[in-house]
Each structure stands twice: as structure tokens, then as C-alpha cells.
């Protein structure tokens, strides 16, 4: 029920992770690169921080890849497949890919979520948690308080 501090990283080395944790003190490190499952387990233990692994769902085979993170990441973040840059691309994926998924660990939904579609996404997928970035921006990189408020209201009213 609270907003938590999340830092998005892509294939970070240990020195960068140490600097991030020391400076920002995030609640969560969200990994959007090609990090190995074991690396997330080590990072979580070493820095005493939650680790989330973003999985781009372009097709059902990505769910097989996701299963390799069970017991290593604290949560999976199902997102649209990366375009040019990982994370925050503003594109939804085919939520039907989650219909038959036996995820077996905590997960969250991301990818193209906005105030006008997040309630439907939650109802369609049963997502226990949602993640947003560009869906609450008035311009690239500029968060809009009215959009954030509308997004949070839509999430609260989705259930």
C-alpha cells in the first residue's frame, strides 16, 4: 500500500550496485538486462535489498526463461519486450500470455500501463502489483502529478 523506492539497472557491476545502494538506499533493485539468476540472488543477499527481474514477454517462451529466476529473484516484472532501451518504453504486451502461466513466485505487471488502461490490465491479468514509468509522464522523463494521482486512483478502483 506504500510507494517504494525502485532503481532500474541494466547489467550493473558490483561497484555500481554498491554505489547505488549506498547513495540511494533503494527498497528494490529492478534488473532489465541479461543478468543471470544467480547474480540476483547474490545481489539481494549482499546488499539486503529486494531484487526484481524484468522479463520481456514477446511470446510464451519468455515464461520459460522467467522460471529460471524462481528462488533467485524476489519478484518477476512482466513487461513488454525491450525496444531500443530497456524499461519505460510505454508499450503494452499481449496480456493473454499470462492466462495459462504458472508463475509460482511473486510478480508484477508493467509495460504501457497508463491511467486509462491500468484497471483493465489488473482485471484481465489478476496482477497483484503494477509498475509504471512513462505512463505517468507529460513529456519524456517528466513525471506528471495529475497523471500519477489518476493512475493510483485507477489502481485502487480496479478491484
PLM region spans:
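Conserved anion-binding
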Residues: 1-109, 113-117
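Short, well-ordered alpha-helices that flank and scaffold nucleotide-derived cofactor binding pockets
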Residues: 22, 45, 120-123, 153, ...
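Alpha-helix termini
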Residues: 107, 124-125, 148
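Internal alpha/beta core interface subdomains
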Residues: 116, 122, 127-136
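C-terminal helical cap(s) of enzyme catalytic domains, especially alpha/beta-barrels
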Residues: 41-43, 133-159
Amino acid at each position: 500500500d506504500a510507494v517504494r523506492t525502485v532503481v532500474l539497472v541494466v547489467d550493473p557491476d558490483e561497484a555500481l550496485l554498491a554505489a547505488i545502494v549506498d547513495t540511494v538506499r533503494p527498497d528494490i533493485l529492478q534488473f532489465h538486462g541479461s543478468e543471470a539468476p544467480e547474480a540476483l540472488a547474490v545481489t539481494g543477499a549482499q546488499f539486503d535489498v529486494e531484487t526484481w527481474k524484468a522479463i520481456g514477454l514477446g511470446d510464451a517462451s519468455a515464461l520459460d526463461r522467467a522460471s529460471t529466476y524462481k528462488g533467485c529473484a524476489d519478484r518477476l516484472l512482466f513487461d513488454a519486450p525491450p525496444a531500443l532501451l530497456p524499461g519505460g518504453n510505454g508499450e503494452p504486451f499481449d496480456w493473454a500470455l499470462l492466462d495459462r502461466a504458472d508463475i509460482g513466485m511473486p510478480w508484477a505487471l508493467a509495460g504501457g500501463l497508463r491511467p486509462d488502461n491500468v484497471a483493465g490490465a489488473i482485471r484481465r491479468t489478476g496482477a497483484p502489483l503494477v509498475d509504471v514509468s512513462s505512463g505517468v509522464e507529460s513529456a519524456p522523463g517528466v513525471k506528471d502529478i495529475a497523471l500519477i494521482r489518476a493512475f493510483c486512483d485507477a489502481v485502487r478502483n480496479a478491484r
